[in-house]
Amino acid sequence: MSESGHSQPGLYGIERRRRWKEPGSSGPQNLSGPGGRERDYIAPWERERRDGSEDPSTNVMQKTPIILSKPPAERSKQPPPSTAPAAPPAPAPLEKPIVLMKPREEGKGPVAGTGASTPEGTAPPPPTAPAPPKGEKEGQRPTQPVYQIQNRGMGTAAPTAMDPVVGQAKLLPPERMKHSIKLVDDQMNWCDSAIEYLLDQTDVLVVGVLGLQGTGKSMVMSLLSANTPEEDQRAYVFRAQSAEMKERGGNQTSGIDFFITQERIVFLDTQPILSPSILDHLINNDRKLPPEYNLPHTYVEMQSLQIAAFLFTVCHVVIVVQDWFTDLSLYRFLQTAEMVKPSTPSPSHESSSSAGSDEGTEYYPHLVFLQNKARREDFCPRKLRQMHLMIDQLMAHSHLRYKGTLSMLQCNVFPGLPPDFLDAEVNLFLVPFMDSEAENENPPRAGPGSSPLFSLLPGYRGHPSFQSLVSKLRSQVMSMARPQLSHTILTEKNWFHYAARIWDGVKKSSALAEYSRLLA
């Protein structure tokens, strides 16, 4: 109470009324006079609040949020990022620590280890709920590089059952060919079946053969590649000319046949050049000629030139087989094929226009002259010198490598001759008749019923045996240098595609087209 007898304003406020209204008896607590209780009851405390609520407890709850709203404001002042966009950086520090890298290393074990890795990340309790899905995603990421490392290092270590099979298949040797297949068919079309036997490796030697009809090209290529003289000729990889075919005067090989050995040596057997049987087949069977050729003999010669020019471009070694010495038309044909051969200049010399620079970058294979079915007098030193001298004079203007890479003197075929016996030694090799070995099975006898003469010594033949000569020829051919065919190093498969482009270019060659017009 004040000195004037009135109550102070702060004594009968809301807090004061809360004290006497909570017990529930308002009569004895009315100390302000007869109208004081009504004044206190009608006082505009609730009207000023404009809430319409008569419960005092609600007023207290309305103030408490105001009081509680201050601590969040104070809390927001302490951390600088208090706004909602600050939430994304929160998981970022969770990814920065290396705690997530530990389950990656442990993820190499069983899958149960991934579940055990989640309690390790309990340091930040709020992201415990999203941590498992992140752990699963992060656990899947390291499994991929680990899988790749295992494949690179181990080769056969892989979780699936097919990977060991693939790894073992890569370690297995390539499939061995049992017979030759077509590289160019009888219609002079390219065949793609040979690429299945090729690999991606660069150590490959390509050997081709040229020769007239009936000289024994297929037999020589079979003996050099996979067969021996003791085997049946019907089992040769390159089918030789049968007796019936010889009687008819026909040719056995048509187009170009392909065979590759386990030593990665490619052998290309070809149809006979300038073949009369092919010409007879064109004339008698009324076979339609291509529109650019008018006469059958022109078409036969152009086919032969296309095959020879193709071999001069894609082969390391070209063997020219003859069965007698010698045919001058064969050397004219070789010079013509060299003239129309596709050029293979280096890219750095493509812009050069001088002929000398082009000759320096041109590719030419090794040329080997094989004298098949040689007689005894052919192995005479005097006759041997004449043969070398004649070939050297006929090929004097050729850029083909016809000398310096094969020698019969160095392989001890003529043990009594000195190395400098031949003034101009060319790549010439002599092989006798294969059937001559059968003559030694019946040694000469003095009489019909007498014992054989010189039974302990072999009969005189004037040359080594057929098997030994073929073996020496094979060793010399396989040991020849392998010059680079193009300006880039070619693998087996790259060589196949390169040969396909060369064959297509040979068929469309402008030089061959011009030469065919001159023949017509």
Swiss-Prot record:
InterPro entries per UniProt: P-loop_NTPase, SMG9
Top-level taxonomic group: Eukaryota
Gene3D superfamilies: P-loop containing nucleotide triphosphate hydrolases
Region described as Disordered: spans on this chain: 1-143
Modification type N-acetylserine: residues: 2
Keywords: Acetylation, Nonsense-mediated mRNA decay, Phosphoprotein
GO-annotated biological processes: brain development; eye development; heart development; in utero embryonic development; nuclear-transcribed mRNA catabolic process, nonsense-mediated decay
Modification after translation, per record: Phosphorylated by SMG1.
Compositionally biased tracts (Pro residues): 78-94, 122-133
MF terms in GO: identical protein binding
Biased composition (Basic and acidic residues): 36-53
Sequence positions bearing Phosphoserine: 2, 4, 7, 32, 53, 451
Disruption-associated phenotype: Embryonic lethal. Homozygous null embryos show a range of abnormalities, including edema, hemorrhage, exencephaly, preaxial polydactyly, decreased size of the mid- and hindbrains, microphthalmia, thin myocardium, and cardiac septal defects. These phenotypes are variable among mutant embryos; there is evidence of incomplete penetrance, but most embryos show clear phenotypic abnormalities.
Disulfide bridge map: none
Function as written in the Swiss-Prot or TrEMBL entry: Involved in nonsense-mediated decay (NMD) of mRNAs containing premature stop codons. Is recruited by release factors to stalled ribosomes together with SMG1 and SMG8 (forming the SMG1C protein kinase complex) and, in the SMG1C complex, is required for the efficient association between SMG1 and SMG8. Plays a role in brain, heart, and eye development.
PANTHER family referenced in this protein's UniProt entry, alphabetically: NONSENSE-MEDIATED MRNA DECAY FACTOR SMG9
Family membership noted in the UniProt record: Belongs to the SMG9 family.
Subunit structure, interactors included: Self-associates to form homodimers and forms heterodimers with SMG8; these assembly forms may represent SMG1C intermediate forms. Component of the SMG1C complex composed of SMG1, SMG8 and SMG9. Interacts with DHX34; the interaction is RNA-independent.
The protein, known as: Nonsense-mediated mRNA decay factor SMG9
Gene symbol of the encoding locus: Smg9
